[in-house]
């Protein structure tokens, strides 16, 4: 009978009803003149709505303090699920805007990150009438891009780690507003070191990067016209072989694909399959090499070739890997094999 009396309560309990639980944050500006947007849900007698608070200051921590002065309750970031960063802001040292989130034990390290094109306010205005939280909306949106192999999955934790890695560079989802003021994927933002280079990959190149990186989501599609007819395939399996020498890294890819769209007849004909395989091989190889040229131009080793060189060919690795990466010959050779042509065969 005495045991319950000896038990103590949770000394660090924090009730959501006493906090403004922020799910989405957006940054724009630069250190010395930072603006941040904080979105959190608020229940009224009629509906659930999203409140957006703007803070200004010289740093992310200062901005947070400024925003706290405008809320009726203390802001709680324990349910933060998405962080948006303007493209101009990301061209500075990105870690300056993330540092404070690693220093508070109550902050999650799993939020999604994305670079946005245009005014930050538009991305927050969109969510004000949503029933779900703002952060949830963008979290699901980015997760959908990951599942379709359009972007490489990164969280606050994994992205933060890469910013300290000198043998691989970060790539983040690049999002813009479409004509109907809805967010849409605009490709991938390429980083070199801790800063956004201003260079991007389009969505088709995003799929190719995921194939090259062997980081496929639920589905990876390649689509084109073949002899005037639509042709679409799903990448089923990727085999990759990398050969390293002092001034060249050769990458060989073997793709096993499944045909998901091809209205023409005779798909079971062996010669037809061979012709399509050659068409896809030429297409993917050409576009892969074009994508690699863009990565090298941006000095952005997005697939971590530097890690492979550092681990297995130490004498070829240089501390300024970004510069070395941009000067290497990196030919990519592709072989596409059709392993399935339809649902039943």
Task: Annotate the PLM regions.
Residues 1-345:
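Membrane-proximal alpha-helical signals and transmembrane carboxylates
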């Amino acid at each position: 009978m005495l045991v319950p009396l000896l038990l103590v309560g949770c000394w660090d309990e924090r009730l959501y009803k006493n906090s403004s639980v922020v799910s989405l944050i957006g940054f724009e500006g630069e250190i010395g003149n930072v603006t941040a947007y904080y979105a959190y849900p608020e229940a009224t007698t009629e509906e659930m709505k999203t409140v957006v608070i703007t803070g200004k200051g010289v740093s992310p921590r200062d901005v947070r303090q400024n925003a706290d002065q405008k809320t009726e309750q203390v802001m709680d970031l324990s349910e933060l699920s998405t962080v948006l960063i303007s493209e101009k802001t990301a061209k500075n040292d990105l870690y300056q805007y993330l540092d404070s989130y690693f220093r508070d034990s109550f902050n999650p390290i799993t939020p999604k990150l994305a670079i946005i094109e245009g005014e930050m306010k538009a991305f927050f205005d969109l969510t004000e009438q949503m029933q779900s939280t703002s952060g949830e909306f963008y979290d699901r949106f980015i997760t959908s891009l990951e599942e379709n192999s359009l972007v490489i999955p990164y969280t606050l934790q994994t992205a933060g780690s890469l910013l300290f890695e000198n043998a691989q560079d970060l790539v983040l989802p690049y999002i813009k507003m479409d004509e109907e003021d809805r967010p849409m994927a605009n490709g991938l933002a390429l980083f070199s070191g801790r800063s956004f280079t201003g260079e991007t990959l389009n969505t088709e190149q995003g799929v190719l990067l995921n194939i090259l990186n062997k980081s496929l989501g639920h589905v990876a599609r390649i689509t084109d016209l073949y002899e005037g007819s639509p042709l679409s395939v799903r990448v089923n399996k990727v085999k990759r072989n990398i050969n390293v020498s002092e001034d060249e890294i050769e990458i060989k890819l073997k793709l096993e694909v499944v045909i998901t769209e091809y209205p023409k007849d005779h798909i079971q004909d062996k010669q037809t399959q061979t012709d399509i395989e050659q068409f896809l091989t030429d297409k993917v190889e050409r576009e892969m090499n074009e994508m690699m040229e863009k990565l090298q131009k941006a000095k952005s080793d997005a697939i971590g070739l530097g890690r492979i060189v550092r681990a297995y060919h130490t004498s070829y690795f240089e501390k300024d890997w970004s510069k070395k990466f941009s000067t290497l010959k990196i030919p990519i050779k592709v072989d596409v094999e059709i392993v399935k042509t339809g649902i039943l065969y």
